[in-house]
């Protein structure tokens, strides 16, 4: 069916008033390009579930797309013989609460018991609920840190991890088999609530989650003197983060007022990503005013955490790699000192995260495992330990994109856990007369200076994906002989499935002091290049990264 015919069918069948008005406002001639974009395909479903711009159309996030995806998920649970129970959480985004309720209605109509959080909660609380109730799946309605125009639908497996590629393919097939209008079962929310096929998640589940997070503490000293500024960036983090901080005695917490309450329009922060300085500007201003020891920011679904710390006359933003290394070293040091370091400890990070983690791991005798990009792969490593009866070996996992997890209580990155650890670590270093900036500099002195940078190359136009593929093919066929003035000594092609990892379209180039990893975005025509350099000073490491970037940009024609 053509995009135009699909548009006409939706115009005739859509009952939602807002979506009907949106479709009615389109003119078949004047708005032909927009109709094509809205209806030329179904919104893609992958390991990250669905994510797209809100609006009417098969290529948009709306109630009909969500219902159809849920119908496919219900069919998958039955076909796979998984428990017919599904936990549901949602964030502060536009439409999230409604999408969560519609998800519950479709599940209940298909005989799947839906456990729904009664209010917005962090993504890690969803991962926890899946395991708490023994569910076959979980759904979190969120688009993470995308702009306000987006929403999404993340699916989790029975282990509390985002679903595998194989599971995503199976769910996708069931979704494609269901018609948006005639192929979806739906029941009354009130009736399903009355008969128990929809159940509201109780406070006992959330309390148990916070208990599990609190048990990740590795120091019981006084934290009351720590002064913290916190911004949930108008997302889900306020309640859980402030509750966990109160539990461990961090009581001097000032919220950024304009960003304290849920608001899916993100009025003060168009791109609510704690990796970006712009997202933390209001927090930085308040931190300067209150002379805070620490600024924390969590993204809308509270699975990523950014931080800034005093450094001289101003504040310094710690990168995801720096925070990962700080937390890793702190956990190793504290658990070694208090006698709780497990035998044969395991830490996990991704292939694009800093090599400094290897130096920390070697120093403390920790086995460091590296996975493909995406925290679900870190969660899978915890699952492997669990199946071997060795869950206690898991010490810490992190990725460069601001995701951290210090326990097996959930299987996704957890900013509630990260906030607890970061505050505790800052309080502990305070007793040593050090700020976190000074602590990071001390680690650089101890392990060497590591610089990490990310470059995104957007290949616009209709042939963007093809050009991206051609660039990677050319790099594989003829990789550069030198980078940053050094000979390339190693080329690793993850397409062949290196180190026991699944085959992935990733290429790694190494010299004596520099590393470049190239991979496609996966969802858009964008190449991502991760630069890493190790040197005697940060200036030298930065110069190596800059030189490698110039070389690769020239190779890519940038």
How would you describe each model-predicted region?
Residues 97-102, 127-131, 149-155, 176, ...:
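Short acidic, glycine/serine/threonine-rich loops at helix termini
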Residues 87-150, 247-307:
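N-terminal small/polar loop signature for handling phosphorylated ligands or for N-terminal nucleophile
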Residues 288, 292-294, 314, 334-519, ...:
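Phosphate-binding and adjacent anionic-ligand microenvironments
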Residues 39-59, 143-146, 232-244, 300, ...:
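Conserved phosphate/anionic-ligand binding catalytic regions in large, soluble enzymes, centered on
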Residues 5-103, 198-226, 236:
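An N-terminal, well-structured beta->alpha segment
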Residues 10, 14, 18, 34-43, ...:
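Gly/Ser/Thr-enriched, mixed-charge loops and adjacent short helices
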């Amino acid at each position: 069916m053509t995009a135009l015919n699909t548009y006409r069918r939706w115009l005739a069948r859509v009952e939602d008033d807002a979506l009907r008005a949106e479709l009615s406002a389109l003119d078949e001639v004047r708005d032909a390009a927009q109709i094509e974009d809205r209806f030329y395909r179904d919104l893609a479903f992958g390991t990250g579930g669905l994510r797209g711009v809100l609006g009417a159309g098969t290529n948009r996030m709306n109630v009909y797309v969500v219902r159809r995806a849920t119908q496919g998920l219900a069919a998958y649970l039955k076909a796979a013989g998984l428990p017919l129970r599904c936990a549901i959480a949602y964030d502060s985004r536009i439409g999230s609460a409604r999408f969560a309720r519609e998800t519950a209605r479709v599940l209940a109509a298909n005989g799947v018991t839906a456990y729904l959080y009664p209010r917005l909660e962090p993504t890690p609380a969803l991962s926890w609920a899946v395991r708490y109730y023994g569910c076959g799946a979980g759904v979190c309605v969120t688009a993470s840190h995308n702009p306000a125009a987006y929403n999404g639908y993340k699916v989790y497996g029975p282990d509390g991890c985002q679903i595998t590629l194989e599971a995503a393919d199976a769910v996708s097939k069931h979704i494609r088999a269901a018609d948006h209008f005639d192929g979806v079962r739906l029941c009354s929310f009130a009736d399903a609530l009355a008969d128990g096929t929809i159940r509201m998640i109780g406070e006992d589940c959330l309390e148990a989650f916070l208990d599990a997070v609190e048990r990740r503490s590795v120091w019981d000293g006084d934290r009351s003197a720590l002064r913290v500024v916190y911004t949930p960036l108008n997302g889900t983090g306020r309640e859980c983060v402030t509750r966990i901080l109160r539990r461990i005695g961090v009581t001097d917490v000032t919220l950024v007022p304009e960003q304290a309450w849920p608001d899916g329009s993100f009025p003060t922060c168009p791109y609510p990503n704690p990796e970006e300085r712009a997202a933390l500007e209001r927090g930085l201003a308040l931190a300067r005013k209150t002379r805070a020891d620490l600024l924390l920011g969590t993204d809308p679904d509270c699975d990523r955490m950014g931080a800034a710390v005093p450094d001289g006359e101003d504040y310094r933003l710690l990168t995801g790699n720096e925070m990962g290394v700080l937390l890793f070293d702190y956990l190793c040091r504290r658990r070694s000192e208090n006698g709780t370091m497990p035998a044969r400890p395991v830490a996990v990070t991704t292939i694009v995260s800093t090599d400094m983690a290897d130096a920390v791991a070697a120093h403390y005798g920790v086995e460091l495992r590296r996975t493909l990009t995406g925290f679900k792969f870190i969660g899978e490593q915890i699952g492997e330990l669990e199946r071997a009866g060795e869950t206690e070996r898991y010490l810490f996992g992190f990725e460069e994109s601001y995701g951290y997890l210090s326990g097996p209580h959930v299987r996704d990155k957890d900013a509630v856990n990260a906030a607890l650890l970061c505050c505790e670590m800052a309080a502990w270093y305070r007793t040593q007369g050090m700020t976190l900036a000074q602590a990071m500099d001390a680690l650089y002195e101890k392990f060497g200076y590591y610089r990490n940078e990310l470059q995104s190359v957007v290949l616009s136009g209709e042939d963007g994906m093809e050009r991206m593929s051609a660039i990677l093919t050319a790099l594989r066929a003829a990789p550069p002989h030198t980078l940053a003035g050094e000979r390339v000594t190693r080329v690793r092609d993850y397409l062949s499935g290196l180190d026991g990892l699944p085959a992935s379209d990733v290429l790694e180039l190494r010299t004596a002091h520099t590393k470049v990893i190239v991979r496609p975005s996966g969802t858009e025509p964008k190449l991502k290049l991760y630069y890493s350099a190790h040197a005697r000073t940060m200036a030298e490491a930065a110069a190596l990264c800059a030189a490698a970037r110039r070389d690769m940009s020239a190779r890519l024609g940038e």
